[in-house]
């Protein structure tokens, strides 16, 4: 029986396999749209559990969970990280064919085993944010940043010669587009202040 995700995942022809394994596989990753918090990179965060890694700030997963009817308590609310992880696992059966399923590949029957195994591995120093980035052969990360962000963590990373992965801010002005939000005018005031226009 073929494994779900082996070394040839998504490589359906011999040409695809040759191009990937002989040329692309060892190419460094330039991640121009990343949701990793630059503070977590600067501080080299060591996560306590898999929920913090997978669900902590991933609005794509949150949106999918909401579309599955999951109560907000289990998404951004006060449920425990374990409860949030279990709700995520329950939803994945509805994500077959979606990259969310490929990235996670678990269900409510395997949730406990995956939870325990991942959390055990996450305690190892080699699983800190910086070490995960380095092990993944990443050489550039562009974080998604609002125009009013201070970029203080980017400045700290730029001055840190112990970490040779370039971490740059990328333009993500979503809040500037949300004119229907009740706090839009407050946002414009913050934007004006950030631009030195007040």
Question: Where do the model's predicted regions map?
Answer:
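Metal-cofactor-binding active-site regions of metalloenzymes
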Residues: 2-29, 34-198
